Amino acid sequence: MITLQGVSPDMIANNLTPFQPTHPGELIKDELEARHVSQSKLAERIGVSPSLLNEIIKGKRGVNTEMALMIEAAMDIPADLLLNLQSAYNMQMAKSDISFMKRLSSIRNIAAIL
């Protein structure tokens, strides 16, 4: 690992955490717009309710494996890309939850004693 003198590893661009995590729904929304396809048309193609798809696109609901595979089949967006985005989003959201991070700290303190 190359380190720069006087530069905190947290301040190197590759180590920065984005201010706002990217939910996979944003990618789906952008692709729909670029292809001039409506949310309702995609929902119909993959056999889900328009409200379910809208919740994913708005970031209110996560993308699971089945949904990722259906979107891949309909739009040729790799399912693993959607799942990786979802996983990174979930991780960043958990790490930004102060209450949860305090809980983790407490668990680590207890585990250190064991």
Regions found by a protein language model. Give the residues of each.
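Generic structural marker for isolated residues within well-ordered, non-membrane alpha-helices
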Residues: I28, Q39, A68
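Short, charged recognition helix plus adjacent turn
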Residues: L83-L114
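The alpha-helix within a helix-turn-helix
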Residues: L32, A43, E72
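N-terminal flexible/basic segments that precede or flank functional cores
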Residues: M1-R35, R103-I107, A111-L114
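DNA major-groove recognition helix of helix-turn-helix/homeodomain DNA-binding modules
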Residues: E66-N84
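Short alpha-helical DNA-recognition segment
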Residues: V37-E55
